[in-house]
Amino acid sequence: MTLQAAPRSAAAQQREPDLRQEVHDAARRARVAARLLAVVPTGVKDRALHAAADAILAHVDRILSANAEDLDAARAADTPAAMLDRLALNPQRVDGIAAGLRQVAGLPGPVGEVLRGYTLPNGLQLRQQRVPLGVVGMIYEGRPNVTVDAFGLTLKSGNAALLRGSSSAARSNEALVNVLRSALDSEQLPADAVQLLSSADRSTVTHLIQARGLVDVAIPRGGAGLIDAVVRDAQVPTIETGVGNCHVYVHEAADLDVAERILLNSKTRRPSVCNAAETLLVDAAIAEHAMPRLIGALQDAGVTVHLDADEQDLRREYLAMEIAVAVVDGVDGAIAHINEYGTGHTEAIVTTNLAAAQRFTERIDAAAVMVNASTAFTDGEQFGFGAEIGISTQKLHARGPMGLPELTSTKWIVRGEGHTRPA
């Protein structure tokens, strides 16, 4: 995806100032809402989250009907199966979305948490505490659950959300946001704490990520094209969320029963998500007898195996039942390969050798490093902090699954008694 659209019609060019104004007006409303939410007690926000969960379940038929329309349009456009899976909702997934809101409601509120405090020799009392970021702009592709995840986490952390989802999920997102806004209104909280930018025009994204002074951070969540375009064109701070070229490395000291289970779970549990394994690395010392077993298990599970993987294969995020395979020379060969081809998301080693595991964890440059565990565990809920707003693959301001603390900044409170600084 690129934010630079093809040559636009005269009508579209005339509408450009209107779109910019619409985005900026929405951002201003969000800013007002964010200032109100910044001082709302955690208990009030938690009640609103439960109200939103109740409302989603009460309107499940409306939500699924809207999603069915999106799916029909996507199938008519020959959308790949992996993308259809991301787009699809069903009663179980809607139940999970509502449960995610309740889980967030049960988490400690980050706003006001004191990170450190002390008194200086001159008597000044200093305290550093968490405060909301403000207005969070979310740009994401066809995953309606992200709409609700973003709402829940931004509300609990005292932020307002400006959402720009994919046109492929437009009906689903609209239905969900309408339900969420009604829930906020019922709890006497500002409905503008969550707004959907509904225009399909890609310039809407540009206006959002260039709304310096109105939007505090932009978080793109989707494929490499979307993320690269947002980071390149943004004039507001951005947090990159994970393109996931994740590896499973089977070390020479691996238990192959364990390796097979981890590999299959990492690849096949949900191949369309960013924490799915995309490359299998096998230690040269065991390749002759391990490869037939591991490759056979993948093929039996319906995975297309790219044995003669070229440069393009090794850098590819398949998001499907496909995987690249390479043989590496020991743990150092695996580390070198991953640091060359990985995207800094999640990397796994399977081994019974503690020294090899330690070397791997110390030298792999990634947000999450697994030892004898599936890459599928890189997830906010699995990490124990509820839904995530994304998995950051950068090193500032957050890294890994982003929950509530990652949606805050800090403020210093300094208390004195008429203190003045000497000349």
Swiss-Prot record:
It comes from Mycobacterium ulcerans (strain Agy99). One of its GO terms (molecular function) is glutamate-5-semialdehyde dehydrogenase activity. One of its GO terms (cellular component) is cytoplasm. This is Gamma-glutamyl phosphate reductase. PROSITE patterns: PROA (PS01223). Its EC number is 1.2.1.41. It catalyses: L-glutamate 5-semialdehyde + phosphate + NADP(+) = L-glutamyl 5-phosphate + NADPH + H(+). Keywords: Amino-acid biosynthesis, Cytoplasm, NADP, Oxidoreductase, Proline biosynthesis. SUPFAM superfamilies: ALDH-like. It is found in: Cytoplasm. One of its GO terms (biological process) is L-proline biosynthetic process. It comes from the Bacteria. Pathway: Amino-acid biosynthesis; L-proline biosynthesis; L-glutamate 5-semialdehyde from L-glutamate: step 2/2. It is an enzyme of class 1 (oxidoreductase). Belongs to the gamma-glutamyl phosphate reductase family. Residues 15-25 have a biased composition (Basic and acidic residues). Residues 1-25 are annotated as: Disordered. Catalyzes the NADPH-dependent reduction of L-glutamate 5-phosphate into L-glutamate 5-semialdehyde and phosphate. The product spontaneously undergoes cyclization to form 1-pyrroline-5-carboxylate. Residues 1-14 have a biased composition (Low complexity).
